[in-house]
Amino acid sequence: SENFLKKIGIDIDADTAQVKYSSSGASCTVTAMCLFEGRPIVNCLVTLNYSDTNLLLVSGTRPLTDASESASGSEMDAATAVMRLIAMLDDSGYLCSSITDVGHCYKMDVSASGTGTLTPLWRFSTDIGDFYINGITGKTETVTQNN
């Protein structure tokens, strides 16, 4: 799957890909998150459907391939992003007792004309769920999985 996607210009996070087999074991579905510059695009998934060893269908959202299409501006550092997260949690009344993982990622926004931008985000995994802070504006972002 990964080699095929690379041939068509799509990088994926193979370590987090999910494979689901049919009850007979004759078919399977592979779903993976796309990458841009090594960072996951959290709302950009690609799915490959196989029957036996034959690829039947590729579906999902094709990520941008041009670095100039990513959002411009300087990204905030991790300490600033954590402070924004704490302020958001406090303002929202969420009770969070631990942050279990922090990482960089992107969110892809596509307009009706087909053009799009990649917005850098900080992703915080906590004991109450994942939260995303815009890496440029510091605002909380809502991420919906596209497939």
Residue ranges of model-derived segments:
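Long, terminal "pre-/pro-" and other extracytoplasmic accessory regions
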Residues: S1-N147
